[in-house]
Amino acid sequence: MSNPWDIVILGCGQLGGNLKTALEAEKIHVLGVRRTPVPDDSTFISLDLDVADAWEQLAQVPLAPNAVIVAIMTPDARTEDAYRQRYVGVSERLRQFVSAPGREHAVIWVSSTAVFGQHQSGVLDESVPAEPDHWRGYCLREAEQNIEQIQAATVIRLTGLYNAQSLKRLQDPEFRAQLDSKVVSNRIHREDAVSWLNALACNYLQKIPVPSLIHGVDMGSARYQEIYDFVDGVSSAIKPATVGRIVNSRYRDRMPALQYPTCEVVINSP
């Protein structure tokens, strides 16, 4: 029998793969679960979590008693049916999975701040109830509610993930035309998102108290126009947003310091 897994990452794509690498660097035994097979790598298994049989196969995988399950779901399409199948369906199956005797594992569920309704503005931290007003938000919130029924669980709502390459798109006039320049951009660098997920997983492994809800966001919420002006050299700094939809977290002091507290740091990098 193989050694039991310390952490299982359900939906081990780009973000999950980066998390897996970070955890393995700390000598943690990590299993990645994804639909697409990874040849010649026994630390991955191929399962379609939309199918009930996949969960029966997962139940046969040896897990450590304190194993942590991290779920990073991505829908196949930007439609209500696709979101409902992937987020609501998988969260319900995951809830059932960890409610079975002997499988009371901690769960980290990656959600999105898109759960907030478009009418919600001001500072939106973890104390503000989400009031979805669109099918996407409804599906995200329903999935969160499934996870909230798990005894040991954290929902982390990520804002827009970015890196240096994706920021370059902001120089493209056609890309800018797709965005409302007056809207506030709430983001977190991909490396910081991985760092926070890593910390949450390790805290659960070490029995360190973890918030049940946390927002993954940097400290640089700003209107797109302010970012454009900085990118174009019109301004010397990005002015933080004071009105509009400003996502924040009450738990920054319990998480690793951000390597990229604002996108200015990335834009100014060589």
Regions found by a protein language model. Name each.
Residues 95-133:
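Conserved Rossmann-fold NAD(P)-dependent oxidoreductase catalytic core, especially the SDR/UDP-sugar
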